[in-house]
């Protein structure tokens, strides 16, 4: 049995190839059935995300294994093998285990340390168990990878610092406000960045969110997901005073929030502080707003400096994480080898017990027929000895004939001979 990991990712293949090799969720069961129908495959898990498509397999070793699996992947997706071969990576046994642990821990992600990949790996594993998983070694490898990812999160700072603009904006808000559960957040725009911001805010228990957008339809879809209120851009002037935090990201060519607008809001708030995070380019908030007392304005450049600092921290944490992964992968492979030895020991013991039972039964039958007890016991001992040493004796003789001193010494050591 051999453990394999093969696939492509954002580092080895452009999106034009990754999208052709991806497995859609509605066809995943069919793909797993087809994969497990291959004679050398004992168990398989398919991980398919926007940044990677990977097969994790338990297989029987054979000479054409790599070619057979590449051929299956290309046939399934109607690809030319040459298009895929140069982008494909291939990991075996310890390297396969280490790769999965790195993936689950976010060490191989486009955004170093991102947490979403662990959920994606868990889902891929769960999907494989719906009547598809056959190999216990593969199941153990995934379960171990989940615990390693948790250990990496717990023992290092790999996920502690924001490395996306959306996450950095929310981290900044959490640093300024002791609790986000009591604040009101005004979100200007309804694009992808604001969508990510709303998810982070919801995770931090923000109760009141207001979304201002040029088109109500898109904003309403997002608002329905997070329980927010939708207003028009023209309503910002009137509603700004309610907001403790304003996060803006639109494609407007001109500022949407001006100095005068914020001055009026601060006056209505009796100068309670406001945090304004402008992550738009061009800027949505006039730079002069930052000069107002109690208005704390941060631009996308300010966030980028936070992200750069945090990315350096994550890279330092990644060194610790890699050490954990290397240690855990080595220990897992040692455990796997021990399991293989346990099966051999069990088979050897079972064989010896069969010989014992067979010869004991014959001896008892001879005693019942009135045979001489001493003669029967001596015969039992002689036959038992010969049967048990027959296979080791043949191996010793063959090693001697082959001039294989190393094997001969291993056999002597195994038999406890000085």
Swiss-Prot record:
Residues of the active site: 50
Domain of life: Bacteria
Enzyme class: oxidoreductase
Enzyme nomenclature, EC number: 1.2.1.70
Reaction(s) this enzyme catalyzes, per UniProt: (S)-4-amino-5-oxopentanoate + tRNA(Glu) + NADP(+) = L-glutamyl-tRNA(Glu) + NADPH + H(+)
InterPro entries (UniProt xref): 4pyrrol_synth_GluRdtase, 4pyrrol_synth_GluRdtase_dimer, 4pyrrol_synth_GluRdtase_N, GluRdtase_CS, GluRdtase_dimer_dom_sf, GluRdtase_N_sf, NAD(P)-bd_dom_sf, Shikm_DH/Glu-tRNA_Rdtase
PROSITE patterns: GLUTR
Binding site for NADP(+): 189-194
Pathway assignment: Porphyrin-containing compound metabolism; protoporphyrin-IX biosynthesis; 5-aminolevulinate from L-glutamyl-tRNA(Glu): step 1/2
UniProt GO MF annotations: glutamyl-tRNA reductase activity; NADP binding
GO biological process: protoporphyrinogen IX biosynthetic process from glutamate
UniProt: substrate binding residues: 49-52, 109, 114-116, 120
Keywords, in A-Z order: NADP, Oxidoreductase, Porphyrin biosynthesis
Site positions for Important for activity: 99
Pfam families registered for this protein in UniProt: GlutR_dimer, GlutR_N, Shikimate_DH
Subunit (UniProt): Homodimer.
Free-text comment about domains: Possesses an unusual extended V-shaped dimeric structure with each monomer consisting of three distinct domains arranged along a curved 'spinal' alpha-helix. The N-terminal catalytic domain specifically recognizes the glutamate moiety of the substrate. The second domain is the NADPH-binding domain, and the third C-terminal domain is responsible for dimerization.
Function statement: Catalyzes the NADPH-dependent reduction of glutamyl-tRNA(Glu) to glutamate 1-semialdehyde (GSA).
Family indicated by similarity: Belongs to the glutamyl-tRNA reductase family.
Other comments on record: During catalysis, the active site Cys acts as a nucleophile attacking the alpha-carbonyl group of tRNA-bound glutamate with the formation of a thioester intermediate between enzyme and glutamate, and the concomitant release of tRNA(Glu). The thioester intermediate is finally reduced by direct hydride transfer from NADPH, to form the product GSA.
Protein's name according to its UniProt entry: Glutamyl-tRNA reductase
Lineage: Bacteria, Pseudomonadati, Pseudomonadota, Gammaproteobacteria, Enterobacterales
Gene designation: hemA
């Amino acid at each position: 049995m051999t453990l394999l990991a093969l696939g492509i990712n954002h580092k080895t293949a452009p999106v034009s190839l990754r999208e052709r090799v991806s497995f859609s969720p509605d066809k995943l069961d069919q793909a797993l059935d087809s994969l497990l129908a291959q004679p050398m495959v004992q168990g398989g898990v398919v991980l398919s995300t926007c940044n990677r498509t990977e097969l994790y397999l338990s297989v029987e070793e054979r000479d054409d294994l790599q070619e057979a699996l590449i051929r299956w992947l290309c046939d399934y997706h109607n690809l030319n093998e040459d298009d895929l071969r140069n982008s494909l990576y291939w990991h075996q046994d310890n390297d396969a285990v280490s790769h999965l642990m790195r993936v689950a821990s976010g060490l191989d992600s486009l955004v170093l340390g991102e947490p979403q990949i662990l959920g994606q790996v868990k889902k891929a594993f769960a999907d494989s168990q719906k009547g598809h998983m056959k190999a216990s070694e593969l199941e153990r490898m995934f379960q171990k990878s989940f615990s390693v990812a948790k250990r990496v999160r717990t023992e290092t700072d790999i996920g502690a610092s924001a490395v996306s603009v959306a996450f950095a904006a929310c981290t900044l808000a959490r640093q300024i406000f002791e609790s986000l559960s009591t604040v009101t957040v005004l979100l200007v725009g309804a694009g992808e960045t604001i969508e990510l911001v709303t998810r982070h805010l919801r995770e931090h228990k923000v109760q009141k969110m207001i979304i201002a957008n040029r088109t109500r339809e898109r904003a309403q879809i997002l608002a329905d997901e997070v329980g927010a209120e939708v207003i028009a851009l023209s309503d910002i002037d009137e509603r700004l005073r309610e907001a403790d935090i304003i996060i803006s990201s639109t494609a407007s060519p001109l500022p949407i929030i001006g100095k005068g607008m914020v001055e009026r809001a601060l006056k209505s708030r009796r100068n309670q502080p406001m945090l304004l995070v402008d992550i738009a380019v061009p800027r949505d908030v006039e730079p002069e707003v930052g000069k107002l007392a109690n208005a704390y304005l941060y631009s996308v450049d300010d966030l980028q400096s936070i992200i750069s600092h945090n990315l350096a921290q994550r890279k330092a944490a990644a060194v610790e994480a890699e050490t954990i992964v290397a240690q855990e992968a080595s220990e897992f492979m040692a455990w796997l080898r021990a399991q293989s030895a346990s099966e051999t020991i069990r088979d050897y013991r079972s064989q010896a017990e069969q010989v014992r039972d067979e010869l004991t039964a014959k001896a008892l039958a001879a005693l019942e027929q009135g045979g001489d007890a001493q003669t029967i016991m001596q015969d039992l001992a002689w036959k038992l000895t010969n049967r048990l040493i027959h296979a080791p004796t043949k191996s010793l003789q063959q090693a001697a004939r082959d001039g294989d001193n190393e094997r001969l010494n291993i056999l002597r050591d195994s038999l406890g001979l000085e």
